[in-house]
């Protein structure tokens, strides 16, 4: 039988060769089967949780515009996309080793005598060479599978960068809003303190107040000016952070006060299964890495067995181009080769040990990813109710402080209390207004964190 007829048979036999990789089994999830949920933000238990697209989750149109711009220009996302392309090319490169390699060649030579003999010897040759490795024990197949899983893991890593970018842009935008609102409160408070200073100064001239009260009024003015400078710096830093995420340094949107309706609340069914974590890209990335490590064990095991390669070719040679392709000038060759590992000082065993240890490391990494993801969701759920309770209490406290300040001012005007009582009420009101803003921002960030922890942010 000619080599040309043997080659397709060998190819089919090699491609259906056995695999020495262990059967893959997904590790059990090292977390509770369900999340512990309060009644806050729950929907009907019969409803399954579905991640809303980010265009639905975020209500504020400005946030949507910024996210779209970041997805187009952000350098981290662009780098992640390039890594996916690199991993895809690497997979194609490795997978190509499983198939026959066919190369053509042609050459010509001219030679003569340096002593003056004019006779010139000419020689022309051409040929085709084919080579193929018989993958009886699945070494090449498993190496290709490992690269395929690495490629899929890189795709999931790119998804994770995408989701993180959506989250970071939204949080950065809300942080800009917070910094602007804090600055507005500080400037408003400064105007109130200046009015109080003018009033105390007027009373001092009439003898109804004293120098101590005037100095106290001047002191809170300077303290507030310091706070304004701090808030201005925070606003500038928030703008810089947002521009970095956007990947461009164009004009940013005008900062506005914090809007509590900028996003939807994440609605979760009672008895939410922790299986939902398996849709997170970081966990899917870890699983693909585990499957790659599993395939590498198969490749390492195959190194203990013989490897067979086939080389075949046809060629022609002639001193004249016109007769180069005559049948009488052609020849063929077929060279099978087998390599049997006999002694390599434990190299193959060491490679297998490394592959098995790395597979065990991948299992641990996969389990860690799941535990971290479970904690992120559990923390966000626990903080959700706490923040709502804190905001309600602080708003009631704020209303009480507004009444207290009004009464303190009235009593001071009638000489019933010292100016220190007014200052204490003003300071408390100022601090509480800032606290309410901080809590509202924290609630927004926590809702985004919960949305992201459940794998949201990939789809539009």
UniProtKB/Swiss-Prot annotation:
It comes from Escherichia coli O157:H7. Homotrimer. Component of the cus efflux system composed of CusA, CusB, CusC and CusF. This is Cation efflux system protein CusC. NCBIfam families: outer_NodT, PRK09837.1. It is found in: Cell outer membrane. Keywords: Cell outer membrane, Ion transport, Lipoprotein, Membrane, Palmitate, Porin, Signal, Transmembrane, Transmembrane beta strand, Transport. Induction: Transcriptionally regulated by CusR in response to copper and silver ions. A lipid is attached at residue 18 (S-diacylglycerol cysteine). SUPFAM superfamilies: Outer membrane efflux proteins (OEP). One of its GO terms (biological process) is monoatomic ion transport. Pfam families: OEP. The keyword Signal applies. Forms pores that allow passive diffusion of cations across the outer membrane. Part of a cation efflux system that mediates resistance to copper and silver. Belongs to the outer membrane factor (OMF) (TC 1.B.17) family. One of its GO terms (molecular function) is efflux transmembrane transporter activity.
